[in-house]
Amino acid sequence: MRNKKWISLAVAVVLTVTALPATVFAAKDGESKEELTKVTLNEVAHSIFYAPQYVAIEEGYFAEEGLDLTLVTGFGADKTMTAVISGEADIGFMGAEASIYAYQEGATDPVVNFAQLTQRAGNFLVAREEMPDFTWDDLKDKRVLGGRKGGMPEMVFEYILRNHNIDPATDLEIDQSIDFGSTAAAFTGDMSADFTVEFEPSATALEREGKGYVVASLGVDSGYVPYTSYSAKTSFLNENPQIIQSFTNALQKGMDYVQSHSPEEIAQVISPQFPETDMDTLTTIVNRYYEQDTWKENLVFEKDSFELLQDILESAGELEKRVDYEQLVTTEFANTAIN
């Protein structure tokens, strides 16, 4: 498979994953940490896009479920998958395409998705100038700072382009050479780029600095897409079903919270996770995701969503052979968490 060297390395070797300072969440109501089960979660990025997860952390839902959670940021699905395969992390949070790549590379202990958090893409198309009448045809013959080849941000972007009869290879120039998290700085410094595809808070930051303007939401224009999900090795799922169930229960509580509270309330709760983001900006970003129906009501990863994901991979030329839904998805824990 083209451009899958990273996942081959993930299957073959153990790498050290760069982490944010480890965050341990203590129990409430006088419960000692010794009574909690330690679990390490490696997230693909630390983003407001994943608000329900941070609500679950800040509201103490993991501790309520008997878990002492350590959160690590992998800074990329390749690194997050490596951490899961190597055993550095018990659970990974990333695009489900990574589990498909690993499976097709011959993983002997497949990484299975057990909960889906987001149902839309979380990035935005940013232009240098305001474009109130923007259409996707405006990208023709332009230069865009995109994402890593084979990653969900780039594939969803290309999926939208194809849906608008735009050939990503010939109708525009997409720069895929810039590391995740560095595109906003590159856009500011490289005036040859006409557009950039950005997650929050970079999109809002560019707007507030007057250096860019959001002209389209990839989440809205791509439709409902299984963008990010939680996964673990088959062996871990089989040996630790109660840990996975408790973890999923805590997440469902976070999902319930965001469905029943305002963006202002959500922003207030998750603010300790983003100390460098002021409350006004945080609220603006949460509201942007809230209004486009980013988060599911439950964590069930439906078959139709998995098939759509594979359609996107196929259209991007990143899928050698389709994988059966039952091989890489289980809904047992998410369905139980609903009740």
Where are the model-predicted features located?
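Soluble non-cytosolic domains of exported or imported proteins
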Residues: S47, G74-D78, F93, G151-M152, ...
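Secondary-structure end/capping motifs
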Residues: N238-E320
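Conserved C-terminal helix/tail region of periplasmic/extracytoplasmic solute-binding proteins
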Residues: L309-N339
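Short, glycine-/small- and polar/acidic-enriched structural segments
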Residues: G30-A169, E173-D179, A186, D194-E200, ...
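Pocket-lining segment of extracytoplasmic ligand-binding domains
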Residues: E129, G181-F274
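Predominant activation on well-ordered alpha-helical scaffold segments within soluble catalytic domains
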Residues: Y54, I100, E158, T204, ...
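Short, low-complexity disordered leader/linker segments with a strong preference
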Residues: M1-K38, T336-N339
